[in-house]
Design a protein with these regions (language model features):
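Hinge/lid segment of periplasmic solute-binding proteins
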Residues: 137-186, 227-232, 250, 341-347
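Extracytoplasmic/periplasmic solute-binding protein
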Residues: 176-180, 185, 211-269, 318
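Extracytoplasmic/periplasmic substrate-recognition and gating elements
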Residues: 101, 107-109, 197, 334-399
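Short, solvent-exposed loop/beta-turn-alpha elements that line the ligand-binding surface or hinge
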Residues: 151-163, 167, 228-231, 236-237, ...
Length: 482
């Protein structure tokens, strides 16, 4: 209190309150009144202490502490972003620095968590120290946090959102989360290998062409014709079904898109018609058939993601894996020259998704509705700036490696060939919804569909049993999770 008093006395002996918060103005006013009434410093100090305690108990100073994140008189605003894509952290820091330089009254703190800890960490944060902006990604997030998610429908950037990208977080006509980045998957190939085998990428843009190209390369591998140039090359594909999200999430999406147009549709369905399960089988068999374990598919259940990527595609042991643009950094780290040889062809299902890439939004940001008005205003401005400013857009694409789910990034190119393929597919419309599986009952796509595929490959279940189990468990899980 004495420090505050001394710093506010002018040369003429009066008090200046310029730049002081309303809380500090109150303290000084109480001290000044005590002196005017003939008191001493100690009496003044006691007066202020008693007054402050009473007012804090009544809640008058609820917004004066540091937790409020802003000072309404000085205009300073502090907010926290809780994000879940650790690979983008450096890019986010660059964006924050740019924004803070343009807005010196704003301080943005970045917290990043990824992997299996994301959901639990966010839940703990929301209970103790809720962030202003937080990452969300699925229907459970809307269910768990919908009551504290700010309506962001009025953001200017929403006018540029690609069709369907806001569906997951739209309720009663209002949008509660901002789509941040898209991802897409198909068959990631070493195009140089195929070209050396006499197969062009353009010839494999539908299922028949892809099968013909794979057969051609397989024959040349089996005959030893590729050995001199590619000594590590063993097979056309790797299929790591130890990873339930590969045989489950992504491959079962083929079946689900037959029955549901969007994840919202799947989320609201109590039953699964199962009309696309023959196509699901076709793609499982297709992938397994081009691996070194084609004659003993049970072994595929021991092959993991790392063996297929860093120990497979990136070292040219295989020419193809079913994956998405997200594998580019790992390939670049292993062998940057191999990344430059890569391309992605569509996840073509004959007569159904020929020429289509499976894409979807896999990351969103929400704004905490209980933040102060100033924090919410800055949060909206930061997000809008990040997605509309040309320099900020470049950082998102080039540093964060994002594929934007908006139509106003037209002139910005991706830094790797896989992301560029997905960006081009978005522009041309050669896409299908790749995240319908996110509307399935909790655990269904991996612990039911993924596990059933493992049983099928191990010879422990035929495909009719796989189909029946998946359909039955959908209904059971829907009932228990309501």
């Amino acid at each position: 209190i004495l420090q505050l008093w001394n710093s506010s006395i002018t040369e003429k002996g009066s008090i200046s309150i310029k730049g002081l918060s309303i809380c500090d103005q109150f303290f000084l006013g109480q001290m000044w009144n005590s002196f005017i009434q003939g008191g001493t410093y100690m009496k003044a100090k006691k007066t202020v202490a008693i007054g402050m305690a009473a007012l804090m108990m009544s809640g008058v100073f609820a917004g004066c502490g540091s937790g409020a994140g802003n000072d309404s008189d000085s205009g300073n605003v502090s907010l926290t972003i809780f994000q879940a894509k650790i690979e983008a952290n450096d890019g986010y820091k660059k964006l924050i620095k740019e924004y803070e330089e343009k807005h010196p009254n704003v301080e943005i703190n970045l917290e990043a968590v990824t992997g299996n800890d994301t959901a639990a960490t966010l839940k703990a944060k929301m209970q103790s120290d809720p962030p202003t902006i937080f990452a969300v990604g699925g229907f459970n997030d809307l269910k768990d946090y919908g009551d504290v998610m700010e309506d962001v429908s009025d953001l200017d950037i929403m006018k540029h959102a690609l069709s369907g990208t806001t569906d997951m977080f739209t309720k009663d006509g209002k949008i509660y989360a901002v789509p941040l980045y898209m991802e897409g998957y198909g068959f990631v190939i070493n195009k140089q290998m195929f070209e050396d085998a006499g197969v062009s990428v353009d010839s494999m843009m539908n299922f028949d062409g892809m099968k013909k190209g794979f057969d051609t390369l397989k024959k040349k591998i089996d005959d030893g014709e590729m050995k001199d140039k590619y000594p590590n090359l063993e097979a056309v594909m790797e299929y790591p079904t130890k990873e339930l999200w590969i045989a489950g999430d992504h491959d079962v999406n083929v079946a689900l898109t037959h029955d549901f147009e969007t994840a919202n549709d799947a989320y609201g369905a109590d039953t699964l018609p199962g009309t696309g399960f023959e196509d699901y089988k076709k793609m499982v068999d297709f992938q397994a058939g081009y691996t070194t374990n084609a004659d003993n598919t049970a072994n595929l259940n021991s092959v993991d993601y790392t063996a297929s990527l860093e120990g497979g595609l990136a070292i040219e042991r295989v020419a193809c894996i079913k994956q998405g643009n997200w594998v580019a950094p790992a390939v670049e780290t292993t062998d940057a020259e191999v990344l430059n040889k890569l391309d992605m062809i569509p996840y073509s299902v004959p007569g159904y998704s020929d020429g289509k890439y499976f894409v979807g939004v896999s990351g969103y940001w929400a704004i905490h509705s209980k933040s102060t008005d100033e924090q919410k205003k800055v949060a909206k401005d930061f997000i809008n700036w990040m997605l509309t400013d040309s320099e900020a857009q470049k950082i998102l694409v080039e540093d964060c490696k994002f594929i934007p789910p908006y139509d106003n990034f037209a002139d910005i190119k991706a830094t790797d060939p896989l992301s560029q393929r997905i960006m081009d597919a978005n522009k041309s419309g050669n896409t299908m919804n790749g995240w319908v599986y996110s509307g399935a009952p909790n655990t269904w796509s991996q612990q039911v569909a993924g596990v059933e595929v493992q049983k099928y490959l191990a010879g422990e279940a035929d495909w009719d049993e796989v189909t029946k189990t998946c359909i039955d468990q959908w209904s059971k899980l829907k009932t228990t999770q309501k």
